[in-house]
């Protein structure tokens, strides 16, 4: 969970919170290197202020009558007892058009169940603050978004996928 009340953004001024899954340190460090590459090579900074994560509930505005503690309590009471924990896996890099470059998390029913349970708990704690996305859920870990220069996505994806091959070779 991240509270972004102190940050202002011209694109999303009313969004104060999102809920995501943090990743193990080794994966986080590798993906921070990917973010650094995108910043150094293309000047990308959008999305780099948040920790590396898989989003479960996208950014939303939490009304003042509710608190982050209300959300945490709801997740603790409604989601944790369901024992929805599992091990996720990353398979390569991909993109949503020319807008978002991401590490592709292998989607399965466990990710969907976790996302649905967390969204339900948030809506129970703070009705109307967000809504379940109607699109199919694609868990992913954004490396860069919104400020990727036009025409560079193919080259950036090639570099990211080569990096993945180097990581696999060094672990094998």
What are these regions (language model features)?
Residues 91-92:
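Short edge beta-strands and adjacent beta->alpha junctions
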């Amino acid at each position: 969970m991240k509270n972004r009340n102190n940050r202002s953004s011209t694109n999303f001024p009313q969004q104060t919170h999102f809920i995501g899954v943090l990743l193990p340190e080794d994966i986080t460090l590798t993906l921070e290197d990917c973010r650094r590459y995108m910043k150094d090579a293309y000047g990308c900074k959008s999305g780099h202020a948040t920790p590396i994560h898989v989003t479960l509930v996208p950014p939303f505005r939490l009304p003042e009558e509710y608190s982050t503690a209300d959300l945490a309590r709801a997740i603790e009471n409604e989601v944790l007892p369901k024992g929805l924990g599992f091990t996720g896996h990353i398979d390569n890099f991909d993109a949503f058009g020319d807008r978002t470059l991401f590490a592709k998390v292998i989607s399965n029913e466990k990710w969907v169940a976790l996302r649905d349970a967390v969204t339900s708990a948030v809506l129970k704690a703070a009705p109307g603050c967000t809504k379940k996305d109607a699109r199919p859920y694609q868990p992913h870990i954004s490396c860069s978004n919104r400020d990727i220069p036009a025409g560079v996505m193919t080259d950036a994806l090639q570099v990211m996928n080569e990096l993945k091959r180097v990581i696999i070779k060094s672990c094998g």
